[in-house]
Amino acid sequence: MSEASLAPPPGAGAATFLLTVRGKVKAATTQEARTVHNSTAGSPAGVEAARSLGDLSHQVFTGYGDGQAGEVLFIDFWNSLPGLGQFFSDPQVLAGADLLFSSRDAPVWSATSGFGDFHLTIPAGKAVTSVGLIRVKVSSLDKAADAFTAYTAATINASRRHGIVSHSVWSRVPNPGDQPDPEVIGVDLWMDTGKMTGYYDLGLGFDALGPVFAGTPDTSVWQSAPGDWTEW
Protein backbone atom coordinates (compact mmCIF):
# COMPACT_ATOMS: atom_id res chain seq x y z
CA MET A 1 0.00 0.00 0.00
CA SER A 2 1.50 3.31 -1.09
CA GLU A 3 1.65 6.44 1.03
CA ALA A 4 -0.49 8.18 -1.59
CA SER A 5 -3.33 5.72 -1.00
CA LEU A 6 -3.31 6.58 2.72
CA ALA A 7 -3.72 10.31 2.18
CA PRO A 8 -7.28 11.63 2.67
CA PRO A 9 -9.09 12.48 -0.56
CA PRO A 10 -9.89 16.09 -1.51
CA GLY A 11 -12.74 17.48 0.58
CA ALA A 12 -12.58 14.66 3.12
CA GLY A 13 -13.57 15.35 6.71
CA ALA A 14 -14.65 13.68 9.92
CA ALA A 15 -18.34 13.76 8.97
CA THR A 16 -19.70 10.74 7.13
CA PHE A 17 -22.48 10.72 4.56
CA LEU A 18 -24.75 7.80 3.75
CA LEU A 19 -25.35 6.77 0.15
CA THR A 20 -28.18 4.33 -0.47
CA VAL A 21 -28.40 2.88 -3.97
CA ARG A 22 -31.57 0.85 -4.42
CA GLY A 23 -32.70 -0.59 -7.71
CA LYS A 24 -34.11 -3.36 -9.84
CA VAL A 25 -31.42 -5.49 -11.42
CA LYS A 26 -31.45 -6.48 -15.08
CA ALA A 27 -30.05 -9.95 -14.46
CA ALA A 28 -32.41 -12.88 -14.11
CA THR A 29 -30.60 -14.23 -11.04
CA THR A 30 -28.72 -12.85 -8.06
CA GLN A 31 -25.65 -14.77 -9.19
CA GLU A 32 -25.67 -13.04 -12.57
CA ALA A 33 -26.12 -9.66 -10.88
CA ARG A 34 -23.16 -10.42 -8.63
CA THR A 35 -20.98 -11.16 -11.64
CA VAL A 36 -21.89 -7.82 -13.23
CA HIS A 37 -21.27 -5.95 -9.96
CA ASN A 38 -17.93 -7.58 -9.32
CA SER A 39 -16.72 -6.78 -12.84
CA THR A 40 -17.73 -3.10 -12.68
CA ALA A 41 -18.04 -1.28 -9.34
CA GLY A 42 -16.52 -4.27 -7.55
CA SER A 43 -13.50 -4.65 -9.80
CA PRO A 44 -10.11 -3.78 -8.29
CA ALA A 45 -9.95 -0.59 -10.37
CA GLY A 46 -13.51 0.35 -9.44
CA VAL A 47 -12.89 -0.22 -5.74
CA GLU A 48 -9.70 1.82 -5.77
CA ALA A 49 -11.39 4.68 -7.65
CA ALA A 50 -14.20 4.83 -5.09
CA ARG A 51 -11.98 4.54 -2.03
CA SER A 52 -9.53 7.14 -3.32
CA LEU A 53 -12.41 9.64 -3.51
CA GLY A 54 -13.79 8.97 -0.03
CA ASP A 55 -15.93 5.80 -0.18
CA LEU A 56 -15.18 4.32 3.25
CA SER A 57 -17.36 1.22 3.06
CA HIS A 58 -19.62 -0.63 0.65
CA GLN A 59 -22.07 -3.40 1.53
CA VAL A 60 -24.59 -5.22 -0.65
CA PHE A 61 -28.03 -6.48 0.34
CA THR A 62 -30.82 -8.19 -1.56
CA GLY A 63 -34.53 -7.80 -1.02
CA TYR A 64 -36.16 -10.05 1.56
CA GLY A 65 -39.61 -11.32 0.68
CA ASP A 66 -41.87 -10.50 -2.23
CA GLY A 67 -41.91 -6.76 -1.60
CA GLN A 68 -38.31 -6.25 -2.74
CA ALA A 69 -37.95 -9.23 -5.11
CA GLY A 70 -35.33 -8.60 -7.77
CA GLU A 71 -33.93 -5.56 -5.97
CA VAL A 72 -30.44 -4.85 -4.69
CA LEU A 73 -29.40 -2.30 -2.06
CA PHE A 74 -25.96 -0.78 -1.66
CA ILE A 75 -25.12 0.96 1.62
CA ASP A 76 -22.01 3.11 1.38
CA PHE A 77 -20.48 5.61 3.77
CA TRP A 78 -18.48 8.48 2.27
CA ASN A 79 -16.51 11.26 3.93
CA SER A 80 -16.11 13.51 0.89
CA LEU A 81 -19.12 14.98 -0.90
CA PRO A 82 -16.91 16.44 -3.66
CA GLY A 83 -15.37 13.00 -4.12
CA LEU A 84 -18.77 11.35 -4.27
CA GLY A 85 -19.91 13.83 -6.89
CA GLN A 86 -16.76 13.31 -8.93
CA PHE A 87 -17.11 9.53 -8.77
CA PHE A 88 -20.69 9.50 -10.00
CA SER A 89 -19.98 11.98 -12.78
CA ASP A 90 -17.59 9.48 -14.35
CA PRO A 91 -19.18 8.05 -17.53
CA GLN A 92 -17.57 4.67 -16.87
CA VAL A 93 -19.18 4.48 -13.42
CA LEU A 94 -22.58 5.40 -14.84
CA ALA A 95 -22.18 2.85 -17.62
CA GLY A 96 -21.43 0.14 -15.06
CA ALA A 97 -24.54 1.07 -13.08
CA ASP A 98 -26.62 0.90 -16.26
CA LEU A 99 -25.34 -2.63 -16.87
CA LEU A 100 -26.52 -3.72 -13.42
CA PHE A 101 -29.78 -1.82 -12.88
CA SER A 102 -32.89 -1.36 -14.98
CA SER A 103 -33.94 1.41 -12.56
CA ARG A 104 -32.31 2.87 -9.47
CA ASP A 105 -32.46 5.62 -6.88
CA ALA A 106 -29.29 6.90 -5.20
CA PRO A 107 -29.97 9.63 -2.62
CA VAL A 108 -27.31 10.96 -0.28
CA TRP A 109 -28.02 11.48 3.42
CA SER A 110 -26.30 13.44 6.19
CA ALA A 111 -26.06 12.46 9.83
CA THR A 112 -28.57 13.87 12.29
CA SER A 113 -28.34 14.58 16.01
CA GLY A 114 -30.97 14.14 18.67
CA PHE A 115 -32.88 11.41 16.83
CA GLY A 116 -32.30 8.62 19.35
CA ASP A 117 -29.56 6.87 17.39
CA PHE A 118 -27.75 3.98 19.07
CA HIS A 119 -24.93 1.60 18.20
CA LEU A 120 -24.51 -1.61 20.22
CA THR A 121 -21.80 -4.25 20.26
CA ILE A 122 -22.06 -7.51 18.33
CA PRO A 123 -21.57 -10.74 20.33
CA ALA A 124 -18.69 -13.00 19.33
CA GLY A 125 -19.60 -15.23 16.41
CA LYS A 126 -22.43 -12.96 15.24
CA ALA A 127 -22.55 -10.51 12.34
CA VAL A 128 -24.85 -8.00 10.69
CA THR A 129 -27.01 -9.97 8.27
CA SER A 130 -30.06 -7.77 7.72
CA VAL A 131 -31.23 -4.20 7.28
CA GLY A 132 -34.56 -2.52 7.91
CA LEU A 133 -35.25 0.84 6.27
CA ILE A 134 -37.92 3.47 6.72
CA ARG A 135 -37.87 6.48 4.41
CA VAL A 136 -40.39 9.30 4.77
CA LYS A 137 -40.93 13.03 4.40
CA VAL A 138 -41.55 14.77 7.72
CA SER A 139 -43.30 17.95 8.81
CA SER A 140 -40.06 19.30 10.28
CA LEU A 141 -36.71 17.89 11.35
CA ASP A 142 -37.09 19.29 14.88
CA LYS A 143 -40.43 17.56 15.41
CA ALA A 144 -39.10 14.39 13.81
CA ALA A 145 -36.13 14.38 16.20
CA ASP A 146 -38.45 14.36 19.20
CA ALA A 147 -40.61 11.63 17.66
CA PHE A 148 -37.73 9.34 16.74
CA THR A 149 -36.19 9.81 20.19
CA ALA A 150 -39.50 8.75 21.76
CA TYR A 151 -39.60 5.77 19.39
CA THR A 152 -36.14 4.63 20.50
CA ALA A 153 -36.99 5.01 24.19
CA ALA A 154 -40.07 2.83 23.72
CA THR A 155 -38.43 0.12 21.60
CA ILE A 156 -34.69 -0.23 22.21
CA ASN A 157 -34.96 -3.01 24.80
CA ALA A 158 -37.43 -5.09 22.81
CA SER A 159 -35.53 -4.60 19.55
CA ARG A 160 -32.25 -5.68 21.15
CA ARG A 161 -33.92 -8.90 22.30
CA HIS A 162 -34.70 -9.49 18.63
CA GLY A 163 -31.09 -8.88 17.59
CA ILE A 164 -30.80 -5.23 16.59
CA VAL A 165 -27.26 -3.83 16.40
CA SER A 166 -27.82 -0.18 15.55
CA HIS A 167 -30.47 2.38 14.70
CA SER A 168 -29.58 5.61 12.93
CA VAL A 169 -31.57 8.37 11.26
CA TRP A 170 -30.25 10.47 8.38
CA SER A 171 -31.62 13.54 6.60
CA ARG A 172 -31.74 13.96 2.83
CA VAL A 173 -29.01 16.02 1.17
CA PRO A 174 -30.70 18.04 -1.60
CA ASN A 175 -29.49 17.55 -5.14
CA PRO A 176 -27.63 20.58 -6.51
CA GLY A 177 -30.14 23.32 -7.30
CA ASP A 178 -33.01 21.67 -5.41
CA GLN A 179 -34.80 23.25 -2.45
CA PRO A 180 -34.45 21.38 0.87
CA ASP A 181 -37.46 19.19 1.59
CA PRO A 182 -37.42 17.55 5.04
CA GLU A 183 -36.99 13.83 4.46
CA VAL A 184 -35.33 11.21 6.64
CA ILE A 185 -34.26 7.61 6.40
CA GLY A 186 -34.01 5.29 9.39
CA VAL A 187 -31.48 2.48 9.08
CA ASP A 188 -31.63 -0.52 11.42
CA LEU A 189 -28.89 -3.17 11.32
CA TRP A 190 -29.75 -6.64 12.61
CA MET A 191 -28.09 -9.99 13.37
CA ASP A 192 -31.02 -12.22 12.33
CA THR A 193 -33.42 -11.69 9.44
CA GLY A 194 -36.25 -13.79 10.86
CA LYS A 195 -36.12 -12.07 14.23
CA MET A 196 -35.97 -8.70 12.50
CA THR A 197 -39.16 -9.30 10.54
CA GLY A 198 -40.83 -10.77 13.61
CA TYR A 199 -40.03 -7.62 15.54
CA TYR A 200 -41.36 -5.31 12.84
CA ASP A 201 -44.57 -7.35 12.68
CA LEU A 202 -45.21 -6.30 16.30
CA GLY A 203 -45.59 -2.69 15.17
CA LEU A 204 -44.05 -1.29 18.33
CA GLY A 205 -43.53 2.44 18.77
CA PHE A 206 -44.98 3.69 15.50
CA ASP A 207 -47.65 5.70 17.30
CA ALA A 208 -44.84 8.10 18.23
CA LEU A 209 -43.75 8.53 14.61
CA GLY A 210 -47.00 8.86 12.71
CA PRO A 211 -47.86 12.45 13.71
CA VAL A 212 -44.65 13.85 12.14
CA PHE A 213 -44.92 11.98 8.84
CA ALA A 214 -45.75 14.23 5.87
CA GLY A 215 -46.42 11.30 3.57
CA THR A 216 -46.68 7.54 3.47
CA PRO A 217 -43.50 5.90 4.79
CA ASP A 218 -41.60 3.54 2.51
CA THR A 219 -40.48 0.56 4.60
CA SER A 220 -38.36 -2.32 3.36
CA VAL A 221 -36.32 -5.23 4.70
CA TRP A 222 -33.09 -6.62 3.29
CA GLN A 223 -30.68 -9.49 3.80
CA SER A 224 -26.95 -9.76 3.18
CA ALA A 225 -26.44 -10.59 -0.48
CA PRO A 226 -25.61 -14.29 -0.91
CA GLY A 227 -22.32 -15.26 -2.49
CA ASP A 228 -19.02 -13.46 -2.80
CA TRP A 229 -19.94 -9.87 -3.64
CA THR A 230 -17.06 -7.40 -3.53
CA GLU A 231 -17.42 -5.35 -0.35
CA TRP A 232 -15.11 -3.28 1.82
Regions found by a protein language model. Name each.
Residues 1-232:
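Short S/T/G/P-rich N-terminal loop/turn motif that feeds into the first structured element of a domain
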